[in-house]
Structure formats: C-alpha cells, structure tokens
C-alpha cells in the first residue's frame, strides 16, 4: 500500500499523522510531492512504485479527475474514483477527456474491495 499526495511536506504529513495512515502505510511508501520533487500527474511518482514493487497489479484510488487518473491510466494501472459526497475542496467534473476518466467510480471506499482481484 502506498500514498501519493500533492502539497507542502509539513502540511501533508500533519494530515497523514492526524488520519493515522502510518499504521497502514510504511513511511517510505508515502510520497509527498514537495519532498519527492514531482507531483501528480508526473510519471516519476507512479514509476517509483513500479520499480519498488515490480510485477504487481497497481491500483490508483483518487478523487481529482484533473490529475489523479491520466498517468495511472497511461501506465495500465486500474483507476478508481471516490465520488464527491460534498466535502471535496476541488470540483469533480466527470465531463473530461477519456484519458482523464477513472476506470471505476465508487461512492464509498469500502466498495474498492470488490474491484481488487
């Protein structure tokens, strides 16, 4: 399990700690764009996991159609969009070009389990 997050390092780590995500994700598998040097949709962030974990099935779960899915789609990852329930900070416009579209859409994170092989 890995995490790709865009933003300032301190801000994103405060969020990660507040959510208790390090109980589920190893710290070295958390990429914060400012510290890593690249953000989404740069291919380097996706390649990091492909190199570290070769010969795996890759799933990308996100909510920002403008940058979350385009590179993951290009790289053959299975993409899943967690649909906005009214709390997103950015507009979730699904009327984007096909390459920006997720393969799947879910209302709840628990629904992802039925997608993963």
Language-model regions, residue ranges each:
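Asp-based, Mg2+/Mn2+-dependent phosphohydrolase catalytic module
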Residues: 4-117
């Amino acid at each position: 399990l890995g995490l790709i997050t865009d933003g300032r390092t301190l801000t994103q780590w405060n969020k990660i700690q507040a959510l208790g995500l390090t109980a589920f994700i190893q710290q070295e598998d958390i990429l914060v764009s400012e510290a890593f040097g690249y953000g989404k949709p740069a291919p380097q962030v996706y390649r990091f996991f492909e190199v570290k974990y070769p010969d795996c099935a890759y799933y990308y779960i996100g909510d920002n159609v403008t940058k979350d899915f385009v590179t993951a789609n290009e790289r053959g990852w299975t993409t899943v969009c967690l649909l906005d329930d009214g709390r997103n900070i950015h507009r979730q416009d699904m009327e984007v070009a096909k390459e920006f579209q997720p393969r799947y859409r879910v209302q709840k994170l628990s629904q992802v389990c039925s997608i993963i092989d």
